[in-house]
């Protein structure tokens, strides 16, 4: 895909819908960056801590800054973090998925439908390679997103002082 024009230079089945898996977290991160502030406090619910690996492993009630959780999300692809962020920004996972789908429509990602914030399998949670290219291109225009994904490692701490190393 040409970054300036958005034209697809080469594609193979680029319009075929497929599960998104962890590329979903690109949209989760972008929405959090656009609809919250880095210093906001985000807590882990029982739903968040119940997510399967890969996960941060925080306990129910643990609180972190949004900035730290976005690093957890993008550096190590933590499923529990995605749910905590989604519940904070969207009020619920379902509310956040609605926001994800609204943003997808705004960006012209017409073959994309979000159900989860972490990319775990769910019926109807899918996109096409072409739409994912468009999303990645949009993401790379966000300086805060780029700063996060270019961070090689980071140690984050919850509000009780428990530290977690991200690499």
Q: Each predicted region: which residue ranges?
A:
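Short, well-structured active-site flanking segments
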Residues: 34-47, 143-151
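Solvent-exposed, polar/charged alpha-helical surfaces in well-ordered, non-transmembrane soluble domains
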Residues: 7, 30, 34, 67-71, ...
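Acidic helix-start/capping segments at beta-turn-to-alpha-helix junctions
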Residues: 43-54, 122, 156-157
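Soluble non-cytosolic domains of exported or imported proteins
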Residues: 14-26, 60-68, 75-79, 90-98, ...
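A short, well-structured edge-of-sheet supersecondary motif
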Residues: 1-11
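Penicillin-recognizing serine hydrolase domain
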Residues: 92-167
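Active-site SXXK
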Residues: 6, 19-42, 132
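Conserved catalytic neighborhood of penicillin-recognizing serine enzymes
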Residues: 51-87, 163-167
């Amino acid at each position: 895909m040409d970054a300036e024009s958005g034209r697809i230079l080469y594609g193979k089945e680029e319009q075929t819908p497929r599960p998104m898996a962890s590329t979903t977290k690109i949209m989760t991160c972008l929405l959090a960056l656009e609809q919250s502030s880095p210093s906001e406090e985000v807590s882990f619910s029982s739903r968040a801590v119940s997510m399967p690996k890969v996960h941060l492993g925080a306990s129910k009630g643990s609180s972190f800054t949004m900035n730290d959780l976005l690093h957890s999300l993008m550096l190590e692809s933590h499923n529990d973090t995605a749910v905590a962020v989604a519940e904070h920004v969207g009020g619920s996972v379902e509310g956040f998925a609605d926001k994800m789908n609204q943003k997808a429509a705004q960006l012209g990602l017409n073959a994309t439908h979000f159900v989860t914030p972490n990319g775990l399998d769910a019926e109807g949670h899918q996109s096409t390679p072409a739409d994912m290219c468009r999303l990645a291109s949009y993401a790379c225009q966000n300086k805060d997103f780029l700063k996060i994904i270019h961070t090689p490692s980071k140690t984050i701490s919850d509000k009780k002082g428990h530290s977690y190393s991200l690499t």
